[in-house]
């Protein structure tokens, strides 16, 4: 089936609240564990080090909070362009502010305009670019121009930075899409069922992502299918692009 773009930002309050209240704990924990596994294998991204980590498209902070809890010595910045989503993330951080001195959320939309880039560079030292680890969960399919994500990686990643991206992958036909919605969202609120279906239709195939990476000069990154609906992109930014 052909790709059908969806809105880039999830900025409806009802939509943001439904997403934040949904139970993604299983997939969120699996992605967090995968990030930590890859970090342990990459020189310069060791989980025991005081790293700068960037979560692109952090939404309400599901992955940001899990990773920050696992890496209290790191500095983690969550970036999102949706005010409604970021407000939920910041509310959760403020509830236990003493627990999260190493976690910060920032409003910014990709591609980063000069004023947003300047705002990042004005953050406290531990949160400024460049970043040793860049992660992203379910952002790519929202972007009408997927090259924006890979351009941002070049813009903000340190030399040899670890990049880990998880996203939905587009089903081959509408029937397969509906089967996934029924399998994974049959009991979800209508707004989540709608958004899940739209997101699956807006997602990319592994082959399309591989072509994006070649065009971006990131052909060394690995693209893998994960379970019945995700794909994973992982790799290190080439040193020669520093």
Predicted regions and their residues:
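N-terminal, positively charged/glycine-rich alpha-helical extensions of SAM-dependent methyltransferases
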Residues: 1-18
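Conserved alpha-helix/loop element of class I SAM-dependent methyltransferases that forms part
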Residues: 25-48
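Conserved class I S-adenosyl-L-methionine
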Residues: 49-57
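Class I SAM-dependent methyltransferase SAM/SAH-binding core
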Residues: 54, 62-112
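A conserved beta-strand element that flanks and buttresses the S-adenosyl-L-methionine
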Residues: 135
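A short glycine-rich, Lys/Arg-flanked "PGG" loop and its adjoining helix->strand segment in the class I
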Residues: 150-159
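Conserved beta-strand signature within the Rossmann-like core of class I S-adenosyl-L-methionine
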Residues: 160-167
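C-terminal alpha-helical "lid/dimerization" subdomain adjacent to the S-adenosyl-L-methionine
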Residues: 168-218, 222-224
